[in-house]
UniProtKB/Swiss-Prot annotation:
It comes from Arabidopsis thaliana (Mouse-ear cress). Its main location: cytoplasm. The modification N-acetylalanine is found at A2. SUPFAM superfamilies: L30e-like, N-terminal domain of eukaryotic peptide chain release factor subunit 1, ERF1, Translational machinery components. Directs the termination of nascent peptide synthesis (translation) in response to the termination codons UAA, UAG and UGA. Modulates plant growth and development. Belongs to the eukaryotic release factor 1 family. The keyword Acetylation applies. This is Eukaryotic peptide chain release factor subunit 1-3. GO terms for biological process: translational termination.
């Protein structure tokens, strides 16, 4: 579950990055094609439509614009030939001629299958790429569990996006409190407590059945909301019969006036704010845990590019935490004199310093073999180091402190590691790491 969650967050980050790049691209005339095909669409339909468009575009008066549009349609047709059918999650294709920052024209073609089904159909020729439909991929589809429990029965449900589902409900007949009974009053009270206890136990057992995935033994929901009109919900949340794995997932305990489906709807309304901030809460928890390791000086943490990469190479990092807008590039540089390959990680200021592109001892020039954002490199390579990758924002107080105070990169370690012992191995170059 955690791995799936982490993978999904990385896919979302990649889409965000792609949208950012596509939104800023501009072209001359209407030579930029945005094409989105939902699942179960037909490639043949789109191919025919593009052929018709090609015929229409041949009549464009302006020669330059006509050539650009025809070229973009041809690119789209060529790319579609690679697909026999639309992939299960749909297909997104952007192609056209864009104008670069230095005024040159450049052909771009991007096609991919989204990480989850896209429910949009789009074909537009314009002077920009249309990315609005991609925003639905960024919407959270986290699933939340709801347990609505009162004196008449319990309802188990889930909410994902705007879709609510009732998994199961059952009713109970609990004896009411009463003052009669004479000598039997204590016995009645005991029977009543026993029935209440059995009711809580049954609810706890069913909760485990519905909200724990038997294959992974992990919760299949991102959070749990307990709701009800009496104190049953509180009793359940504090009961030792309630699975501790689910106890850790409780986001909120709310009072509702009804039981059953009406109570379910009311619980959703009352929890709306908490559910919308769940990513925010997870981020605060993660960075809070990181700060706790630092304040207790456990040695199970690492920060800064250089130390984090050393710990990664050793396989010591369990969770790699990176600010989603970290502006550092990874350079693969070749020393032309010795043929040696050097890896450097440089921020914007360091890129302007030419000494970073020369050998410190011989002053030989280092030729750039490859340059890519460090974030992208992490997204592609993190699994190789056996860690999970978590992107964080600087919107929460903790996130902002992490970005300002720790350079926006760090990790929680599997075991204690004193990074100072590796300092003498370093050559003192900031953001540098050699293969």
């Amino acid at each position: 579950m955690a791995d799936q969650e982490s993978d999904k967050n990385i896919e979302i980050w990649k889409i965000k990055k792609l949208i950012k790049g596509l939104e800023t691209a501009r072209g001359n005339g209407t030579s930029m094609i945005s094409l989105i095909m939902p699942p179960r669409d037909q490639v043949a339909r789109v191919t025919k439509m593009l052929a018709d468009e090609y015929g229409t575009a041949s009549n464009i008066k302006s020669r330059v614009n006509r050539q650009s549009v025809l070229s973009a349609i041809t690119s789209a047709q060529q790319r579609l030939k690679l697909y026999n059918k639309v992939p299960p999650n749909g297909l997104v294709l952007y192609t056209g001629t864009i104008v670069t920052d230095d005024g040159k024209e450049k052909k771009v073609t991007i096609d991919f299958e989204p990480f989850k089904p896209i429910n949009a159909s789009l074909y537009l020729c314009d002077n920009k790429f249309h990315t609005e439909p991609l925003n639905e991929l960024l919407e959270s589809d986290d699933k939340f569990g709801f347990i609505v429990m009162d004196g008449n029965g319990t309802l188990f449900g889930t909410l994902s996006g705007n879709t609510r589902e009732v998994l199961h409900k059952f009713t109970v007949d609990l004896p009411k409190k009463h003052g009669r009974g004479g000598q039997s009053a204590l016995r009645f009270a005991r029977l009543r407590m026993e029935k209440r206890h059995n009711y809580v136990r049954k609810t706890a057992e069913l909760a485990t059945q519905f909200y724990i995935n038997p294959a992974t033994s992990q919760p299949n929901v991102s959070g749990l909301i307990l709701a009800g009109s009496a104190d049953f919900k509180t009793e359940l949340s504090q009961s030792e019969l309630f699975d501790p794995r689910l106890q850790a997932k409780i986001l909120n305990v709310v009072d509702v006036s009804y039981g059953g489906e009406n109570g379910f709807n009311q619980a959703i309304e009352l929890s709306a704010e908490i559910l919308s901030n769940v990513k925010f809460i997870q981020e605060k928890k993660l960075i809070g845990k990181y700060f706790e390791e630092i304040s207790q000086d456990t040695g199970k943490y690492v920060f800064g590019v250089e130390d984090t990469l050393k710990a990664l190479e050793m396989g010591a990092v369990e969770t790699l935490i990176v600010w989603e807008n970290l502006d550092i590039n990874r350079y693969e540089l070749k020393n032309n004199t010795t043929g040696e390959i050097v890896i450097k990680h440089l921020g914007k200021d360091q890129e302007n310093n030419q000494s970073n592109f020369h050998d410190a001892e011989t002053n030989a020039e280092l030729e750039v073999q490859e340059k890519m954002p460090l974030l992208e490199w992490f997204a592609n390579e993190y699994k190789r180091f056996g860690c999970t990758l978590e992107f964080v924002t600087n919107k929460s107080q903790e996130g902002s402190q992490f970005c300002r105070g720790f350079g926006g990169i760090g990790g929680l370690l599997r075991y204690q590691l004193d990074m100072r012992t590796f300092d003498e191995l370093s050559d003192g170059e900031v953001y540098e790491d050699s293969d």
